[in-house]
Amino acid sequence: MGGDLPPSHQTEVFENLINDKLNQFCPEKTVRISSQDKPWVTAEIKYLDRLKNREYTKKGKSLKYKQLAKQFKEKYEMEAKKYLRKNMDELMDCKPGQAYSVLKKMGAQPGDCIDSNTFTLPGHESENLSDQESAERIADYFAQISQEFPPLDRKLLPLRVQQKLDSQSSLPPIIDSHDAYQKIKAAKKPKSGVPGDLPRVIVQEFAPELAAPVYSIINNITQSGEWPTQWKQEWVTPIGKVPIPETEDDLRPISLTPFFSKVTEHFVVMWLLEYIGELIDFRQYGGIKGNSITHYLIEFLNFILINQDSTDQTAILACMVDFKKAFNRQNHNLLITKLSDMGVPSWLLKVVMAFLSDRKMVIRYKGKLSSMKNLPGGGPQGTLLGLLLFIVLINDAGFE
């Protein structure tokens, strides 16, 4: 599918075709979900409840009503058990620091499932800002941080990197339909996607059929060094870094990106790690498979105990440093230079450059959307590739 079309055009054809067929064979039905619902209540349960109540209003406790009531009860109990069983498994397998959040989720009461950005910042309240104006203010704040840096530009890169980009030291790999199918099945499907994303159940059921056009698009991306424009739009939900946010500084932007962009990121991360995996500082515990904050704490305690046993050590001073908005303050030109110096080939550098260039963001706040904002710097939080690129940027920060 797509032939010699650019990735953006090929992606547009693919998404339009899929959405047209989806609307034709699976038309949308509106189901209202309340913040007072239990966390295991699904759209199907709400739909059955509505049918049951409608039948009761028309004909009382008819045979059809009893059948619908039975279906509703069975579905409700099944989803409740599934929800609790899943969270029990998660509790048994989770890291120690995550246990509280899992337990809190298991004991969710009506009203606990309210959207995470229902807070109102005191400054916005005192200025009498509408939800739309607040969304715009938050978007301007986050965009302003990223705009501290110049956009990614080949002319701003060192000469050695420019020469590398003009050369072709190796050819990009070619993936097949089976490779794409495995990544589609493995990729995490968020409960709330971005506009245009396919429903999770459709992706799950039709993964084999979707794999063919997806692998064609990914091969087109690696061959052309272009990233689809549609996949560079971030739908950002601000969440509080503290229980009660006071200012925009207390907010963390969590990005949602198109599902098939995430699938492509899985491949890019895999290819990057083939070149730089062994060069990542062994003291980097966050975002690295097999490492966790628990490993860091053990290493830190070990460092303290070893130095306490030393005869020439009388005191140990530990200084904890936190860089403000570090994820939003990434210089893309510096990042590409570091990747090049770590041995990443030109074709893969071009793919990463395409991923980072011309990104845009829109804030979702209390059901309102801000206008699109340009992001010449920073990295999308909540994305697989964005996390690895941040690790690369700070890789040489540690020293003995």
Would you name each region that the model predicts?
Residues M1, L388, A397-E400:
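Short, intrinsically disordered, charge-balanced linker/junction segments flanking boundaries
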Residues M1-H9, E28-D37, Y56-G60, N87-M88, ...:
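Short, solvent-exposed helix-loop connector elements
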Residues G2-R32, E90-C94, F142, P151-D153, ...:
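Amphipathic alpha-helical blocks
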Residues P7, T11, E15, D131, ...:
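Short, charged, low-complexity patches
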Residues F14-I33, K59-D176:
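Basic/polar low-complexity segments
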Residues V41-D49:
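Short amphipathic alpha-helical heptad-repeat segments
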Residues F142, S170-P380, L388:
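Conserved pre-catalytic core of RNA-dependent polymerases
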